[in-house]
């Protein structure tokens, strides 16, 4: 294992010999540390609690934004409807960017990394008129779409990932941000016969957030956005030679109440997974804050896990794909 000093002074720079990039504070409780270059296959973005210890963004950040952090699975508290609708979102991909970043579900502490396909870094294509992702894209922590459980609404099993979130606020967020969002609705994408829920939400700190309470408010105040969202998800794999994606409910966006049921169900499945009550497959459930989980580790063990990550090369790959535009016929 390498010493911590090289990890901080070498691994965080944009190039060899660069000054260390200090951990970036995220909201009030979380910050991030970069290991390697963002355009390299060994790039990792690790999460730390503001107290200084490493955590998993998948397992250690509470699902509910009003939840007190305890060394246990967070328990719900009675709140009014608006307050009950506040959730934490982990931002993986900022709006207008193309790099397919994601929580590494199979790696200890689940850092964010760029997806790799056929040995190359994966970029989402620009399909005219959209540049990259048209929302801030990320995930709800402490949720899991179980690949062994058939969804009663879609009749398809889950995609083995945390639930995805499309944040529609006006601000472009940063990779690794942890923001409080209001849930507005959901879209059920069927990807290779798997259910892949897309939650529509808005950052509570967005200037327009007070106007949005349910999916119909998106239609009212951001006309065309839901249609663009549906079209984006239908077409984004076409430039790779794949067919258009399909949707449950004929592509209908479901309302907030429906979305909350989807989230609650995925949270219950996550609880079973992190307590080793179901088959988790290759997913890493290593966590720091859930003391009664069989996968719990100490803060010192979490630090050792990060220190044991091989020193990354600072070589970056070409990102030509980000500049290519695709024009598709109707």
Swiss-Prot record:
**Highest taxon above the source species:** Eukaryota
The EC class name is: hydrolase
Q: What processes in GO biological process is this protein linked to? A: diphosphate metabolic process; phosphate-containing compound metabolic process; regulation of mitochondrial membrane potential
Q: What is its EC number?
A: 3.6.1.1
Which Gene Ontology cellular-component terms appear in the entry?
A: mitochondrion; synapse
Q: Which residues carry this modification: N6-succinyllysine?
A: 211, 254
Q: Which GO terms describe its molecular function?
A: inorganic diphosphate phosphatase activity; magnesium ion binding; protein serine/threonine phosphatase activity
**What positions does the entry give for Mg(2+) 2 binding?**
164
Q: Which reaction does it catalyse?
A: diphosphate + H2O = 2 phosphate + H(+)
Q: Does the keyword Metal-binding apply?
A: yes
For the ligand (Mg(2+) 1), the binding residues are: 159, 164, 196
Tell me the Pfam families matching this sequence. Answer: Pyrophosphatase
Cofactor(s) this protein requires: Mg(2+)
Per the record's keyword annotation, is Metal-binding included, yes or no?
Answer: yes
Which compartment or compartments is the protein found in? Answer: Mitochondrion
Q: Which SUPFAM superfamilies match?
A: Inorganic pyrophosphatase
What does the UniProt keyword field contain? Acetylation, Hydrolase, Magnesium, Metal-binding, Mitochondrion, Transit peptide
For this chain, the family text in UniProt reads:
Belongs to the PPase family.
Oligomeric state and partners? Homodimer.
Q: What does this protein do?
A: Hydrolyzes inorganic pyrophosphate. This activity is essential for correct regulation of mitochondrial membrane potential, and mitochondrial organization and function.
Designated name of the protein: Inorganic pyrophosphatase 2, mitochondrial
Naturally occurring in which organism (per UniProt): Mus musculus
